[in-house]
């Protein structure tokens, strides 16, 4: 029903993967949307959306924003969405528990949210950890390992630069992501947020 609705209303190519139980113990549906299927002159651009079967603790009514000025018929649409604070908590928890690797978008998103003045809601972190069927002790242990890898493993920075090149304009990549000083800034900010998260009781 979701696929048919998105395809009919917006003319987008959409696929949905059946839920899989990831190592976080959470059922996750993978939604993939090709944004401009009619543009054969451009590389295929996909938006990947994970829909997880976990509760949102800090929902707020939000108006759907149209950053690109394209009329999608969604003007004025109000949705219940997670607060940015809860999204930041999710990103820090994902940094600790995501299977097999550090996801570069988590690093970028943590920095972006902090640049928007968002504070990590420490009171919410234990509930989010519990939603993922882990303990606070496991969170601290895993996060410590991931934070130490940020500077200890040069491949982490190389992977980050490579992935961000896919999402950001070339000038932004040259002026920020490719600069050693940006990596130092980013890792210090992420380590600082991680240290704050590990103070929970």
Predicted regions and their residues:
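Structured mid-to-C-terminal alpha-helical surface segments
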Residues: 1-201
